[in-house]
């Protein structure tokens, strides 16, 4: 199970103002079946088994918009990523673990390189305590940049058929765009939803900015132009 409150549905789950420039610190605890893993915006600070159930308490978040609060819970398996300077992890269904382990090196490289590039280019450290990527089957979007925990549509990362190079570039664009949103959209947020275009446009641009560092720059900017020209 997972949440998806964008753009203004957090108030369906708890009393709040779904206004993006009104930010709050969230504390969150949940009880799940023992075999489940739960992922939230912040780190889990306490986990214990009580009467066959797993109780998890998360650290308080930094100030975030209500639409960026999220959790996902289920029989996920974790693929460990780098731990410095920001912990990077991927969570995937058990049935897709082998496939994810095959694709993880490339996704990890994109995330690592993107993280370094954005920290350097923005002149600001990663704004949250960790960065998780959770692969979800049938997710409504290609990705959603919840603070510290991006949710990605599973088949956008784990291809169902042999991918073309264009498919791989598309995946790179998605991974890097959602990562860029952690700064522009999550850390810095528009006043109201009529300016969604600003954060989306900027994150898309920055995805290609990072791709131009990772891949051939001329080819990436040509791809950017061809995919965005009127």
Tell where the protein language model's regions lie, with residue ranges.
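Acidic/His-enriched low-complexity segments
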Residues: 1-130, 155
